[in-house]
Amino acid sequence: MLKVITKEIPINEELKTRIQFICDFCNTTPTFINGSIRKVEKTNINYIEPNKIIIKGTTFLAFNHGRDVYVENLQKHINISDLQEFIKNL
């Protein structure tokens, strides 16, 4: 039987601070949910679950040390520098 090991990855403080700063300008409060690494024991299969940031009911996904955030899924991404304008249009 396969055993899946899950280890939580806390969101990077620099990323968290940047997003909080952007949200302050947009008069909104983000909710942060830490990502995780899921590893199938005795294999080389790993899955990195991104950090989730919920802003105005929209879920954004972000990886630590990344420059992009993803909107709802990993198909649509925007640069963190464009996040403020995107939030204003929500």
Question: Model-found features: residue ranges?
Answer:
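Residue-level detector of alpha-helical secondary structure
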Residues: T6, N12, K16-C23, N27, ...
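Acidic, low-complexity, intrinsically disordered interaction modules
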Residues: C23-S81
